[in-house]
Amino acid sequence: MSATAREIDTPYGLARAHSQLVERPRAGMVLGHGAGGGVTARDLLAATETSHEHGVSVVLVEQPYRVAGRKSPPPAAQLDTAWRAVVESLRGDELSGLRLLVGGRSSGARVACRTVEAVGAAALLCLAFPLVPPARRSGPPPVSRLPELDAVSVPTLVVQGENDRFGIPPAGPRRRVAVVPGDHSLRSGLAGLRTALGEWLGEVV
């Protein structure tokens, strides 16, 4: 396996792609991080290791705002545009000619959902999808992000902690939901994540 990192220019600054490529890959997966976290989140690393075991190369993507040292993400449209630029670059280089899978954790899962068809991905992985923001003491009630998941037409795996404060999405015609121990961090559910992802990869790759 080879591990490299390179910066990729996007309309909103430089992103960073951390590639972990297996020999004779069966597919390539691109994963994004959460809003306030990075590519070293435990669930992303567990997903990477499991993907390698199934012959899938993985690229972990740092959005431009994280590369620039900012903690708060920009508007969704900027995240989506930067993500599309990164995936396009990867498809012309590290993942050229491979069946493409995309995904991420939390905010990164939402970005992958919204852009899955635009980048031509064959399947989608959502770790800790933030379904409904926790209610605030004042202001309007939170809005569900379920329409983002429902708009996806490719096979989808959602891995969600049973105590996730954002809730648990329902399964759908092409959407499998694996509920594992733990909360939004998925730290207590890594074994379940690996099992669910391994089974799913055996079907979609």
Task: Indicate where each model-derived feature is located.
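Hydrolases whose catalytic domains are alpha/beta-hydrolase-1, hotdog thioesterase
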Residues: 111-115, 135
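Serine-hydrolase catalytic machinery in alpha/beta-hydrolase-like enzymes
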Residues: 6-99, 111, 145, 179
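Short beta-strand/loop motif that positions the catalytic acidic residue
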Residues: 152, 158-160
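Catalytic histidine-centered segment of alpha/beta-hydrolase-like enzymes
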Residues: 182-195
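Gly/Ala-rich beta-loop-alpha elbow adjacent to hydrolase catalytic centers
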Residues: 104-112
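Short beta-strand immediately N-terminal to the catalytic nucleophile in serine-hydrolase-like folds
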Residues: 99-104, 127
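A conserved short beta-strand
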Residues: 120-133
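Conserved alpha/beta-hydrolase "acid-adjacent" motif
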Residues: 165-170
